């Protein structure tokens, strides 16, 4: 289902807000995460405006990560505050993305995103501890084996879900779609090499450790099984046999 949603910029504010609600973000006056509707609205607006010049890290990417977060939350049976936090973190995990590889310090991009979100979170009256909690979640999306990220992933179930949501499209979508996303990322980040090789390398990297959450592993296994069933159907059809 997620693969049918276009990966494009712009993704309108209205569509992005609707995807957040679909993923399970509560709609009362103050979400169970502690954010007011005003705060959530400002975060959605900022996310929808993200990176008009970026080929990959734009609002379309945010939409797909939010959808993945919703599916993972459902699989993990998350409700209330935890689900709201996961969806909000997925929405804002790449705010103010540079649109290129950063040569700056480790976690630079994640801290930039956390800083942009913190201004809104605290500025609309939420507890500073909530901003710190969101920052910890965002650090989990850095593709590094640094000891800080390893410790966060080991101790924080929501961080494991967010890290999986961030890469879920690349490891679970049909190969042609995943390859298209890789082309966008290659152009944006100016990564040398062919898209096929980059995707293969990334899949091998993920394959060494697997996804971080039980929910992610279950959904990935289901996606792989569905793709295999489709391939089997095509193979049977090619022999001229009836497919039930």
Task: Please give the residue ranges for each predicted region.
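Divalent metal-dependent phosphate-bond-processing catalytic cores, especially two-metal-ion Mg2+/Mn2+ enzymes
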Residues: 1-25, 55-63, 67-82, 92, ...
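Short amphipathic alpha-helical interaction patches enriched in hydrophobic/aromatic residues
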Residues: 24-27, 48-51, 73, 96-100, ...
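Eukaryote-skewed repeat-based solenoidal scaffolds used as protein-protein interaction platforms
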Residues: 25, 29-34, 135-139
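Active-site flanking loop/helix segments enriched in acidic
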Residues: 38-67, 96-102
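His-Asp-centered metal-binding catalytic motifs of divalent-metal-dependent phosphohydrolases/nucleases
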Residues: 65, 83-102, 113, 135-144
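An active-site-proximal "capping" alpha-helix that borders the catalytic cofactor pocket
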Residues: 65-68, 108-124
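Inter-helical turn/loop segments and adjacent helix faces that build the functional surface
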Residues: 76, 102, 120-130
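Alpha-helix N-cap and coil->helix boundary residues
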Residues: 81-82, 108, 129-133
